[in-house]
Amino acid sequence: MRNTELIEWFRQSAPYVNMHRHKTFVIMLDGNAIAHPNFINITNDISLLHSLGIKLVIVFGARCQIENLLKQNNISSSYHHNIRVTDSNMLEIIKQAVGGLHYDIFSRLSLRLPHSPVLNVVSSNAILAQPLGVIDGVDYGLSGKIRRINIEAIQQQLAQNAIVVIGPIAPSVTGKMFNLAFEEIATQLAIKLKVDKLIAFCDRQGLLDEQGKVISDIHPREAKQHLKKFIQQGDYHHSAARFLQAAIDVCHAGIKRSHLISYQTDGSLLQELFSRDGVGTQLSEASSECIRLATSFDIAGLLNLIRPLEDQGLLVKRSREQLEMEISQYTIIERDGIVIACAALIHYPAEKMAEMACVAVHPDYRDSARGDILLEAIKRRAYKLNIEKLFVLTTQTIQWFQERGFVQIQPTDLPVEKQRHYNYQRMSKVLMLALDN
């Protein structure tokens, strides 16, 4: 990464550093993630999150390690509803696998980066289990489910600046150990702790669309359709499918956001949390992006967006004072607290006309539909004001507006007040759209 790229990334990440500080995240790591060569980088990134003041609970699974140990001991497994039926011999193998991974996680988190503080990593016995029992005539043996979680104990550990690590086995009230699905543990912990995020490291970089591109944001309702496809295609064993169910469940329970990212990609955790669009898939009941009327608090963001375009001569220069006086005219698209697009509606009531002015979209989003979204929002505002004609002045985007129904007119067709201020040196083209009220 060149110095300029590093500086730009660091500047863009600053709002997210403040946004995530003192928040609580549950991180899901399955056995494949822990066994992957990139795991050392994942633990370094987890340490970095902790140093930034983020409270972390790591919930890990051991499915692939358990399978390998069972094969080595010539023990076969049976499943019912994708849950392992566990007997006493298997449980000893499971405890061995889980104990080994516990040690691996602790040792990796103890490998500090140079000059970094010592991490306080603790194991929690806050989970109390009970047997699954008999379902559909199948006795699950020592496979269990959560009976109770001592949330207060975990909160105390987090308050003491500890990273809490929880594995997929837990005792019952009688002291008998049970094998639990770590997805259930992560889901219930996230819900009962009321965390800010659930982050799952999968075998793929989130969910993909029909073109094979990562879906950056998705509503849980749409995510359910992807889950159905996984099940129909027999792909439920993939971690992306199993973790997707957990992400959907916690979103429905009120957790603001869940993320699916790849454990195979170096830096995916940092890119997902500290950049506008991330690298994986974010699930949220409320989108991270919204379109709304601007307020005085948006002026700094507006200036950051339009200044480069003004310097290039694409927009007429506007002072901060002018923006402050005209802020009520602006509609913005905001993403994670950052203004990524804007447009103003300037009303000329005598002629029942209005100008769509200061149209700007951040370079990262110009290939998307943000311009169309802005235009539709401006048209809706215009309808409410009984505006009959919407016009724009442009030097570079003539074709874009023509493709959306605007036709070229003469400056003399503008409202009288606008004609007085028309800049004949700039020679902007004037385009008009008739609005059907």
Curated annotation (Swiss-Prot):
Pfam families registered for this protein in UniProt: AA_kinase (PF00696), Acetyltransf_1 (PF00583)
Top-level EC class as recorded in UniProt: transferase
UniProt-listed InterPro entries: AceGlu_kinase-like_sf, Acyl_CoA_acyltransferase, Asp/Glu/Uridylate_kinase, GNAT_dom, NAGS_kin, NH2A_AcTrfase
Superkingdom to which the source organism belongs: Bacteria
Chief place of localization: cytoplasm
More info: In bacteria which possess the bifunctional enzyme ornithine acetyltransferase/N-acetylglutamate synthase (ArgJ), ArgA fulfills an anaplerotic role.
Record-linked PANTHER family: AMINO-ACID ACETYLTRANSFERASE, AMINO-ACID ACETYLTRANSFERASE NAGS1, CHLOROPLASTIC-RELATED
Name the record gives this protein: Amino-acid acetyltransferase
Gene symbol of the encoding locus: argA
